[in-house]
Amino acid sequence: MIDATPSHAVLREFFDNSSLTWGLMACGIAQLSKLFLELLLHRRWRPAVLIETGGMPSSHSALVTGTAACVGWTLGFDHPLFALAAMVAFVVMYDASGIRRAAGLTAERVNALPDSLWPYAPEKPLKESLGHSRLQVLVGSLMGPAIALPGLEFVGSPLHLSLIHISEPTRPS
């Protein structure tokens, strides 16, 4: 049977997913903090850090740990979906501090090679900031639940905040 649910209801359910919303909020705040750290530590305003990978803190770690924490908080930490979310979080964090970091270090060394070694001139240097140090992953993984759980507990779904004055039409009795 075909589901006749209106598409706006599906979109509303998607945007009303508190675990997803607060995981994304944790990711966004972690990414935004990179801009302020750049300003504080290097005394320069460089908005490009908002779309770059790597650096302090790991926004991907904040995303997956924030989402996993919300799933555990709402469904229970013994729920199979929390186990899945936690395993995905571990894989993402391992990848960020292991494989992606190694790829970035390799790119750094390749970029340091003299141009005379190449049969043709490279168009642009390889991207070096790919992964994270363990500290960057740790800070991101702590930021995730620290942002997502209070948001989930005290605010709930941000969609509910925007719809406080909007209610479903009621029919007169």
Task: Give each language-model segment a name.
Residues 28, 32, 47-163:
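Membrane-embedded catalytic cores of phosphoryl/pyrophosphoryl-handling enzymes
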Residues 38, 42, 46:
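Helix-loop segments that flank and shape redox-cofactor active sites
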